[in-house]
UniProtKB/Swiss-Prot annotation:
Family according to the record: Belongs to the krueppel C2H2-type zinc-finger protein family.
GO cellular component: nucleus
Name of the protein in question: Zinc finger protein 662
Keyword Transferase recorded: no
Domain KRAB: 1-44
PROSITE patterns named in the record: KRAB, ZINC_FINGER_C2H2_1, ZINC_FINGER_C2H2_2
Length: 426
Protein backbone atom coordinates (compact mmCIF):
# COMPACT_ATOMS: atom_id res chain seq x y z
CA UNK A 1 0.00 0.00 0.00
CA UNK A 2 2.91 2.32 0.67
CA UNK A 3 3.98 2.11 -2.96
CA UNK A 4 0.80 3.98 -3.92
CA UNK A 5 1.75 6.78 -1.59
CA UNK A 6 4.34 8.05 -4.04
CA UNK A 7 1.66 8.35 -6.68
CA UNK A 8 -0.62 10.52 -4.56
CA UNK A 9 2.18 12.47 -2.88
CA UNK A 10 1.47 15.33 -5.25
CA UNK A 11 -1.53 16.09 -3.04
CA UNK A 12 0.99 17.18 -0.38
CA UNK A 13 0.34 20.78 -1.24
CA UNK A 14 -3.06 20.45 0.41
CA UNK A 15 -3.21 19.92 4.19
CA UNK A 16 -4.32 16.36 4.94
CA UNK A 17 -2.78 13.70 7.23
CA UNK A 18 -0.87 10.77 5.76
CA UNK A 19 -2.69 8.13 7.93
CA UNK A 20 -6.05 9.27 6.55
CA UNK A 21 -4.78 8.85 3.01
CA UNK A 22 -3.53 5.31 3.71
CA UNK A 23 -6.85 4.40 5.31
CA UNK A 24 -8.66 5.52 2.15
CA UNK A 25 -6.39 3.34 0.03
CA UNK A 26 -6.88 0.32 2.30
CA UNK A 27 -10.66 0.66 2.03
CA UNK A 28 -10.36 0.76 -1.75
CA UNK A 29 -11.67 4.31 -1.92
CA UNK A 30 -10.40 6.92 -4.34
CA UNK A 31 -8.09 9.24 -2.37
CA UNK A 32 -9.34 12.79 -1.98
CA UNK A 33 -8.74 15.85 0.16
CA UNK A 34 -10.42 19.17 0.83
CA UNK A 35 -9.38 21.99 -1.44
CA UNK A 36 -8.70 25.32 0.29
CA UNK A 37 -10.83 28.09 -1.06
CA UNK A 38 -7.73 30.02 -2.04
CA UNK A 39 -6.79 27.22 -4.43
CA UNK A 40 -9.98 27.70 -6.39
CA UNK A 41 -8.90 31.29 -6.94
CA UNK A 42 -5.61 30.13 -8.43
CA UNK A 43 -3.56 30.42 -5.22
CA UNK A 44 -1.38 27.75 -3.71
CA UNK A 45 -2.00 26.91 -0.04
CA UNK A 46 -0.05 29.15 2.28
CA UNK A 47 3.28 27.88 3.49
CA UNK A 48 3.81 25.44 0.60
CA UNK A 49 7.27 25.50 -0.98
CA UNK A 50 7.30 26.72 -4.56
CA UNK A 51 9.67 23.94 -5.56
CA UNK A 52 7.17 21.19 -4.80
CA UNK A 53 4.37 20.28 -7.23
CA UNK A 54 0.72 20.44 -6.23
CA UNK A 55 -2.51 19.52 -7.98
CA UNK A 56 -4.37 22.20 -9.86
CA UNK A 57 -8.12 22.29 -9.20
CA UNK A 58 -10.27 22.38 -12.33
CA UNK A 59 -11.63 25.64 -13.57
CA UNK A 60 -8.51 27.74 -13.01
CA UNK A 61 -7.19 29.50 -16.06
CA UNK A 62 -3.59 28.83 -17.05
CA UNK A 63 -1.44 29.58 -20.09
CA UNK A 64 -1.80 26.09 -21.58
CA UNK A 65 -5.32 24.61 -21.32
CA UNK A 66 -5.52 20.82 -21.12
CA UNK A 67 -8.10 18.74 -22.95
CA UNK A 68 -9.32 16.79 -19.90
CA UNK A 69 -9.54 18.88 -16.71
CA UNK A 70 -9.36 17.27 -13.28
CA UNK A 71 -12.63 15.94 -11.88
CA UNK A 72 -13.97 17.66 -8.75
CA UNK A 73 -16.32 15.99 -6.29
CA UNK A 74 -18.39 17.92 -3.77
CA UNK A 75 -18.63 16.58 -0.24
CA UNK A 76 -20.74 18.44 2.26
CA UNK A 77 -20.66 22.19 1.87
CA UNK A 78 -17.04 22.57 0.76
CA UNK A 79 -15.48 21.40 -2.51
CA UNK A 80 -13.27 18.30 -2.48
CA UNK A 81 -10.57 17.27 -4.93
CA UNK A 82 -10.42 13.74 -6.37
CA UNK A 83 -6.94 12.46 -7.27
CA UNK A 84 -7.08 11.70 -11.04
CA UNK A 85 -7.22 7.97 -11.83
CA UNK A 86 -4.56 8.41 -14.46
CA UNK A 87 -2.07 9.45 -11.79
CA UNK A 88 -2.97 6.56 -9.51
CA UNK A 89 -2.71 3.93 -12.25
CA UNK A 90 0.50 5.23 -13.78
CA UNK A 91 3.31 2.64 -13.85
CA UNK A 92 7.08 2.90 -13.86
CA UNK A 93 7.29 2.00 -17.55
CA UNK A 94 5.43 5.24 -18.31
CA UNK A 95 8.22 7.26 -16.72
CA UNK A 96 9.01 10.38 -18.72
CA UNK A 97 12.59 10.44 -19.99
CA UNK A 98 14.98 13.04 -18.65
CA UNK A 99 15.31 14.67 -22.08
CA UNK A 100 11.56 15.18 -22.24
CA UNK A 101 11.57 16.66 -18.75
CA UNK A 102 14.27 19.13 -19.72
CA UNK A 103 12.39 20.15 -22.86
CA UNK A 104 9.22 20.57 -20.82
CA UNK A 105 11.07 22.65 -18.23
CA UNK A 106 12.44 24.90 -20.97
CA UNK A 107 8.88 25.40 -22.25
CA UNK A 108 7.76 26.35 -18.76
CA UNK A 109 10.36 29.08 -18.49
CA UNK A 110 8.65 31.17 -21.18
CA UNK A 111 5.92 32.00 -18.66
CA UNK A 112 6.46 35.46 -17.30
CA UNK A 113 3.94 35.43 -14.45
CA UNK A 114 1.55 33.18 -12.61
CA UNK A 115 2.06 29.60 -11.47
CA UNK A 116 4.33 27.37 -13.58
CA UNK A 117 2.25 24.66 -15.29
CA UNK A 118 3.13 21.02 -15.93
CA UNK A 119 0.82 20.19 -18.83
CA UNK A 120 1.48 16.44 -18.98
CA UNK A 121 0.44 15.89 -15.36
CA UNK A 122 -2.01 18.82 -14.99
CA UNK A 123 -0.02 20.24 -12.08
CA UNK A 124 1.10 23.64 -11.01
CA UNK A 125 4.87 23.88 -10.47
CA UNK A 126 5.84 26.84 -8.31
CA UNK A 127 5.00 30.53 -8.61
CA UNK A 128 6.76 33.69 -9.62
CA UNK A 129 8.02 36.44 -7.38
CA UNK A 130 5.04 38.67 -8.24
CA UNK A 131 2.87 36.49 -6.00
CA UNK A 132 5.43 36.32 -3.22
CA UNK A 133 3.35 38.35 -0.78
CA UNK A 134 0.39 35.94 -1.00
CA UNK A 135 2.34 32.78 -0.17
CA UNK A 136 3.59 33.53 3.32
CA UNK A 137 6.94 31.74 3.65
CA UNK A 138 8.54 32.01 0.22
CA UNK A 139 11.87 30.25 -0.43
CA UNK A 140 12.61 31.47 -3.93
CA UNK A 141 11.37 32.31 -7.39
CA UNK A 142 11.86 31.02 -10.92
CA UNK A 143 14.15 33.00 -13.17
CA UNK A 144 15.70 31.85 -16.44
CA UNK A 145 15.39 28.16 -15.65
CA UNK A 146 16.82 28.27 -12.11
CA UNK A 147 15.47 28.65 -8.61
CA UNK A 148 17.10 31.64 -6.94
CA UNK A 149 16.93 32.72 -3.32
CA UNK A 150 18.93 34.71 -0.80
CA UNK A 151 18.05 32.09 1.84
CA UNK A 152 18.15 28.31 1.80
CA UNK A 153 15.80 26.78 -0.74
CA UNK A 154 13.62 23.98 0.57
CA UNK A 155 12.70 21.17 -1.79
CA UNK A 156 10.26 18.54 -0.58
CA UNK A 157 10.93 15.06 -1.91
CA UNK A 158 10.05 11.50 -0.95
CA UNK A 159 12.81 9.54 0.79
CA UNK A 160 12.15 6.01 2.05
CA UNK A 161 8.37 6.39 1.92
CA UNK A 162 8.43 9.54 4.05
CA UNK A 163 8.08 13.22 3.23
CA UNK A 164 11.15 15.22 4.28
CA UNK A 165 12.65 18.61 3.53
CA UNK A 166 16.08 18.76 1.93
CA UNK A 167 17.89 22.06 2.44
CA UNK A 168 19.99 23.20 -0.48
CA UNK A 169 22.93 25.16 0.92
CA UNK A 170 23.72 26.77 -2.43
CA UNK A 171 21.79 29.77 -3.67
CA UNK A 172 20.77 28.14 -6.97
CA UNK A 173 18.77 24.98 -7.59
CA UNK A 174 18.19 23.66 -11.08
CA UNK A 175 14.47 23.73 -11.79
CA UNK A 176 14.91 20.87 -14.27
CA UNK A 177 15.94 18.71 -11.32
CA UNK A 178 12.79 19.76 -9.46
CA UNK A 179 10.65 18.74 -12.41
CA UNK A 180 12.48 15.43 -12.59
CA UNK A 181 11.74 14.76 -8.93
CA UNK A 182 8.13 15.80 -9.50
CA UNK A 183 7.63 13.38 -12.38
CA UNK A 184 9.27 10.48 -10.56
CA UNK A 185 6.96 10.98 -7.57
CA UNK A 186 3.90 10.86 -9.83
CA UNK A 187 5.17 7.68 -11.47
CA UNK A 188 5.35 5.79 -8.19
CA UNK A 189 9.15 5.95 -7.95
CA UNK A 190 10.74 6.57 -4.56
CA UNK A 191 13.85 8.70 -4.24
CA UNK A 192 16.76 7.74 -1.99
CA UNK A 193 19.06 10.72 -1.47
CA UNK A 194 22.67 10.45 -0.24
CA UNK A 195 23.27 12.98 2.53
CA UNK A 196 27.00 13.09 1.73
CA UNK A 197 26.89 14.14 -1.93
CA UNK A 198 23.18 14.66 -2.70
CA UNK A 199 23.07 11.96 -5.39
CA UNK A 200 19.60 10.44 -5.96
CA UNK A 201 18.70 6.78 -6.50
CA UNK A 202 15.39 5.08 -7.31
CA UNK A 203 16.55 1.66 -6.09
CA UNK A 204 17.30 0.98 -2.42
CA UNK A 205 20.03 -1.53 -3.35
CA UNK A 206 21.87 1.06 -5.45
CA UNK A 207 21.47 3.60 -2.64
CA UNK A 208 23.00 1.24 -0.04
CA UNK A 209 25.86 0.31 -2.36
CA UNK A 210 26.59 3.99 -3.04
CA UNK A 211 26.74 4.88 0.67
CA UNK A 212 29.44 2.27 1.22
CA UNK A 213 31.72 4.16 -1.17
CA UNK A 214 31.78 7.11 1.26
CA UNK A 215 32.87 4.73 4.04
CA UNK A 216 35.77 3.46 1.92
CA UNK A 217 34.26 0.00 1.52
CA UNK A 218 35.11 -1.95 -1.62
CA UNK A 219 31.82 -3.64 -2.41
CA UNK A 220 32.34 -4.52 -6.08
CA UNK A 221 34.43 -7.68 -6.40
CA UNK A 222 35.94 -9.31 -9.48
CA UNK A 223 34.59 -12.85 -9.91
CA UNK A 224 37.81 -13.97 -11.63
CA UNK A 225 40.48 -12.90 -9.13
CA UNK A 226 38.54 -11.53 -6.14
CA UNK A 227 40.00 -8.03 -6.32
CA UNK A 228 37.57 -5.47 -4.85
CA UNK A 229 36.73 -1.92 -5.92
CA UNK A 230 34.77 0.98 -4.46
CA UNK A 231 33.08 1.83 -7.75
CA UNK A 232 31.29 -0.44 -10.20
CA UNK A 233 32.86 1.30 -13.20
CA UNK A 234 36.35 0.46 -11.90
CA UNK A 235 35.37 -3.18 -11.46
CA UNK A 236 33.97 -3.37 -15.00
CA UNK A 237 37.15 -1.83 -16.42
CA UNK A 238 39.30 -4.27 -14.41
CA UNK A 239 37.40 -7.28 -15.75
CA UNK A 240 38.57 -6.37 -19.25
CA UNK A 241 41.99 -7.63 -18.20
CA UNK A 242 40.54 -11.13 -17.86
CA UNK A 243 38.29 -10.97 -20.92
CA UNK A 244 40.95 -9.39 -23.14
CA UNK A 245 38.57 -6.68 -24.32
CA UNK A 246 40.39 -3.50 -25.35
CA UNK A 247 37.73 -0.98 -26.39
CA UNK A 248 40.00 2.06 -26.67
CA UNK A 249 41.91 2.09 -29.97
CA UNK A 250 44.47 4.59 -31.24
CA UNK A 251 43.42 6.05 -34.59
CA UNK A 252 47.05 6.62 -35.57
CA UNK A 253 48.50 3.12 -35.15
CA UNK A 254 45.43 0.99 -34.24
CA UNK A 255 46.96 -0.08 -30.91
CA UNK A 256 44.20 -0.92 -28.41
CA UNK A 257 44.03 -0.41 -24.65
CA UNK A 258 41.95 -1.61 -21.71
CA UNK A 259 41.86 1.82 -20.06
CA UNK A 260 41.03 5.14 -21.68
CA UNK A 261 43.73 6.84 -19.60
CA UNK A 262 46.33 4.54 -21.19
CA UNK A 263 45.12 5.54 -24.65
CA UNK A 264 45.46 9.23 -23.77
CA UNK A 265 49.04 8.69 -22.56
CA UNK A 266 49.86 6.66 -25.67
CA UNK A 267 48.54 9.34 -28.01
CA UNK A 268 51.15 11.75 -26.64
CA UNK A 269 53.75 9.64 -28.46
CA UNK A 270 52.16 10.68 -31.76
CA UNK A 271 51.46 14.29 -30.80
CA UNK A 272 54.74 14.84 -28.95
CA UNK A 273 52.84 16.50 -26.12
CA UNK A 274 54.74 16.70 -22.82
CA UNK A 275 52.44 18.48 -20.37
CA UNK A 276 54.41 17.65 -17.22
CA UNK A 277 57.44 19.93 -16.80
CA UNK A 278 60.21 19.81 -14.21
CA UNK A 279 60.46 23.11 -12.31
CA UNK A 280 64.16 22.55 -11.65
CA UNK A 281 65.49 22.02 -15.18
CA UNK A 282 62.48 22.58 -17.44
CA UNK A 283 62.53 19.09 -18.92
CA UNK A 284 59.10 17.90 -20.12
CA UNK A 285 57.47 14.50 -19.76
CA UNK A 286 54.43 12.83 -21.27
CA UNK A 287 53.47 11.14 -17.99
CA UNK A 288 53.23 12.47 -14.46
CA UNK A 289 54.90 9.34 -13.07
CA UNK A 290 57.93 9.97 -15.28
CA UNK A 291 58.19 13.51 -13.90
CA UNK A 292 58.04 12.21 -10.32
CA UNK A 293 60.85 9.74 -11.01
CA UNK A 294 62.92 12.43 -12.73
CA UNK A 295 62.58 14.86 -9.82
CA UNK A 296 64.33 12.35 -7.58
CA UNK A 297 67.51 13.11 -9.53
CA UNK A 298 67.38 16.66 -8.16
CA UNK A 299 66.32 15.68 -4.63
CA UNK A 300 68.59 12.64 -4.40
CA UNK A 301 65.73 10.56 -3.06
CA UNK A 302 66.06 6.80 -3.55
CA UNK A 303 63.06 5.21 -1.85
CA UNK A 304 63.55 1.66 -3.18
CA UNK A 305 66.24 -0.25 -1.23
CA UNK A 306 67.57 -3.76 -1.79
CA UNK A 307 67.26 -5.88 1.37
CA UNK A 308 70.21 -8.06 0.33
CA UNK A 309 72.93 -5.45 -0.18
CA UNK A 310 71.34 -2.14 0.85
CA UNK A 311 71.67 -0.50 -2.56
CA UNK A 312 68.95 2.06 -3.27
CA UNK A 313 67.18 3.09 -6.46
CA UNK A 314 64.95 5.90 -7.65
CA UNK A 315 62.52 3.55 -9.44
CA UNK A 316 60.93 0.28 -8.34
CA UNK A 317 61.54 -1.47 -11.71
CA UNK A 318 65.26 -0.77 -11.29
CA UNK A 319 65.17 -2.44 -7.87
CA UNK A 320 63.38 -5.50 -9.28
CA UNK A 321 65.97 -5.86 -12.05
CA UNK A 322 68.79 -5.50 -9.51
CA UNK A 323 67.36 -8.20 -7.23
CA UNK A 324 67.69 -10.72 -10.05
CA UNK A 325 71.46 -10.49 -9.57
CA UNK A 326 71.00 -11.97 -6.09
CA UNK A 327 68.39 -14.56 -7.03
CA UNK A 328 69.91 -15.49 -10.40
CA UNK A 329 66.46 -15.35 -11.98
CA UNK A 330 66.44 -15.13 -15.77
CA UNK A 331 62.78 -14.78 -16.76
CA UNK A 332 63.41 -13.80 -20.38
CA UNK A 333 64.23 -16.81 -22.58
CA UNK A 334 65.18 -16.89 -26.25
CA UNK A 335 62.78 -19.07 -28.23
CA UNK A 336 65.47 -19.88 -30.81
CA UNK A 337 68.28 -21.15 -28.59
CA UNK A 338 66.76 -21.30 -25.09
CA UNK A 339 69.27 -18.90 -23.55
CA UNK A 340 67.92 -16.97 -20.57
CA UNK A 341 68.39 -13.32 -19.66
CA UNK A 342 67.72 -11.18 -16.62
CA UNK A 343 66.45 -8.22 -18.60
CA UNK A 344 64.12 -7.97 -21.56
CA UNK A 345 66.43 -5.47 -23.25
CA UNK A 346 69.22 -8.07 -23.24
CA UNK A 347 66.89 -10.63 -24.80
CA UNK A 348 65.92 -8.17 -27.54
CA UNK A 349 69.57 -7.52 -28.36
CA UNK A 350 70.37 -11.24 -28.33
CA UNK A 351 67.55 -12.07 -30.74
CA UNK A 352 69.20 -9.81 -33.31
CA UNK A 353 71.95 -12.42 -33.53
CA UNK A 354 69.39 -14.85 -34.94
CA UNK A 355 67.59 -12.32 -37.12
CA UNK A 356 70.74 -10.50 -38.31
CA UNK A 357 69.13 -7.16 -37.53
CA UNK A 358 71.66 -4.35 -36.89
CA UNK A 359 69.61 -1.21 -36.28
CA UNK A 360 72.42 0.97 -34.88
CA UNK A 361 74.52 2.47 -37.70
CA UNK A 362 77.60 4.68 -37.49
CA UNK A 363 77.06 7.98 -39.29
CA UNK A 364 80.80 8.33 -40.03
CA UNK A 365 81.59 5.00 -41.72
CA UNK A 366 78.21 3.29 -42.08
CA UNK A 367 79.10 0.26 -39.97
CA UNK A 368 76.11 -1.28 -38.16
CA UNK A 369 75.82 -2.96 -34.76
CA UNK A 370 73.39 -5.16 -32.83
CA UNK A 371 73.18 -2.90 -29.78
CA UNK A 372 73.67 0.77 -29.10
CA UNK A 373 76.50 0.20 -26.61
CA UNK A 374 78.64 -1.34 -29.36
CA UNK A 375 77.98 1.66 -31.58
CA UNK A 376 79.05 4.06 -28.81
CA UNK A 377 82.34 2.18 -28.32
CA UNK A 378 82.95 2.18 -32.07
CA UNK A 379 82.34 5.92 -32.40
CA UNK A 380 85.24 6.62 -30.01
CA UNK A 381 87.54 5.50 -32.81
CA UNK A 382 86.34 8.48 -34.86
CA UNK A 383 86.19 10.97 -31.98
CA UNK A 384 89.40 9.85 -30.23
CA UNK A 385 87.63 9.84 -26.87
CA UNK A 386 89.31 7.73 -24.16
CA UNK A 387 87.21 7.92 -20.99
CA UNK A 388 88.90 5.04 -19.09
CA UNK A 389 92.12 6.15 -17.36
CA UNK A 390 94.68 4.07 -15.45
CA UNK A 391 95.30 5.34 -11.91
CA UNK A 392 98.85 3.95 -11.82
CA UNK A 393 100.36 5.40 -15.00
CA UNK A 394 97.70 7.78 -16.31
CA UNK A 395 97.26 6.01 -19.62
CA UNK A 396 93.74 6.27 -21.10
CA UNK A 397 91.70 3.84 -23.14
CA UNK A 398 88.53 3.93 -25.23
CA UNK A 399 87.13 0.71 -23.73
CA UNK A 400 86.87 -0.42 -20.12
CA UNK A 401 87.85 -4.00 -21.00
CA UNK A 402 91.18 -2.78 -22.41
CA UNK A 403 91.84 -0.80 -19.20
CA UNK A 404 91.28 -3.93 -17.08
CA UNK A 405 93.82 -5.91 -19.15
CA UNK A 406 96.31 -3.04 -18.83
CA UNK A 407 95.96 -2.90 -15.03
CA UNK A 408 96.85 -6.59 -14.78
CA UNK A 409 100.33 -5.77 -16.10
CA UNK A 410 100.89 -3.39 -13.21
CA UNK A 411 99.77 -6.13 -10.82
CA UNK A 412 102.35 -8.59 -12.23
CA UNK A 413 105.17 -6.07 -11.79
CA UNK A 414 104.40 -5.59 -8.07
CA UNK A 415 105.95 -8.22 -5.68
CA UNK A 416 103.62 -9.94 -3.23
CA UNK A 417 104.55 -9.24 0.42
CA UNK A 418 103.86 -12.27 2.63
CA UNK A 419 102.80 -11.03 6.03
CA UNK A 420 103.22 -14.46 7.64
CA UNK A 421 106.91 -14.88 6.63
CA UNK A 422 107.61 -11.38 7.85
CA UNK A 423 106.31 -12.28 11.31
CA UNK A 424 108.34 -15.52 11.44
CA UNK A 425 111.57 -13.61 10.89
CA UNK A 426 110.95 -11.79 14.16
Amino acid sequence: MLENYGAVASLAAFPFPKPALISQLERGETPWCSVPRGALDGEAPRGISSGYPFLKPAGISHPEQVEEPLNLKLQGEGPSLICPEGVLKRKKEDFILKEEIIEEAQDLMVLSSGPQWCGSQELWFGKTCEEKSRLGRWPGYLNGGRMESSTNDIIEVIVKDEMISVEESSGNTDVNNLLGIHHKILNEQIFYICEECGKCFDQNEDFDQHQKTHNGEKVYGCKECGKAFSFRSHCIAHQRIHSGVKPYECQECAKAFVWKSNLIRHQRIHTGEKPFECKECGKGFSQNTSLTQHQRIHTGEKPYTCKECGKSFTRNPALLRHQRMHTGEKPYECKDCGKGFMWNSDLSQHQRVHTGDKPHECTDCGKSFFCKAHLIRHQRIHTGERPYKCNDCGKAFSQNSVLIKHQRRHARDKPYNCQISHLLEH
